Amino acid sequence: MAAEQRKIIEQLMGSNLSNFTSRGLVHFTDRKVCRSFLCGICPHDIFTNTKMDLGPCPKIHSDKLKSDYERASYSHDYGYEWDYLEDLERHVDDCNKRIDIAEARREKTKEEEERIDELMRDIIHTDHSIEVIITEMEALAKRKLVNDAVKHFIELNRLKTYRKELYDEVISMNEIPSQASTTHQKLQVCDICSAYLSRLDNDRRLADHFSGKMHLGYAMLRNIARDLRAQLEDREKSRDKKDGEKQRDNLASFEDKISTSFVA
């Protein structure tokens, strides 16, 4: 939506609108120009109208400057693709962090559920102990064994206090409705876009997710970043190889000149 709005405004107010700053016309080398847009696609334009909407890019997007850059880059390497890669990988890294956090939250909820099960088992066991003590107290009272009955009464109060502590912990951990907690255990985290997926979702809902704008956007970011890094690293290796060959040729030429001068 942001990209479409930008194009409409440019059409209404002139094609050079986005080439202007307060100082006048700008060149694509100006730091105010978005290098991601020049080299490919700006992440700000990918996630519009999704929950990951980044808002409008603070830098200049101009189709004319993009064309100027593409023409100029045939004869000169400006290094902007490395800036583009850094921008892409920053957003991918942010997404990966959200995936890790989402996984941690999911695992934490599972641990909490296990703790609740443990607490409930302790409560049941404590309830049984309380029933046994009450039965024994009644028997002791009938036999007029007051001292033993008092000891049982003290133990009864301790168990009741302990049971209340267990119950209070269960209540505090169950502030989230049980249905939501149960559902949480059935969730998994998408390793592309960090969204939660339910293991109970039918094929249609899963298809809707995988064809959704946010999922496709992050899939595209990851693919572009992976391919661009491989391309740039191969280019660097090729350049280093050529530089090495050039240095060897220069050294060989220098050695030939030295040899010739000695012969002369």
Curated annotation (Swiss-Prot):
Summary of the function given for this chain in its UniProt record: Component of the U1 snRNP particle, which recognizes and binds the 5'-splice site of pre-mRNA. Together with other non-snRNP factors, U1 snRNP forms the spliceosomal commitment complex, that targets pre-mRNA to the splicing pathway.
Residues in coiled coil: 83-126
Record's subunit section: Component of the U1 snRNP particle, a subcomplex of the spliceosome.
Organism this protein belongs to: Schizosaccharomyces pombe (strain 972 / ATCC 24843)
Protein name, per record: U1 snRNP-associated protein usp106
Cystine crosslinks: none
GO cellular component, one term: U1 snRNP
Keyword terms of this UniProt record: Coiled coil, Cytoplasm, mRNA processing, mRNA splicing, Nucleus, Ribonucleoprotein, Spliceosome
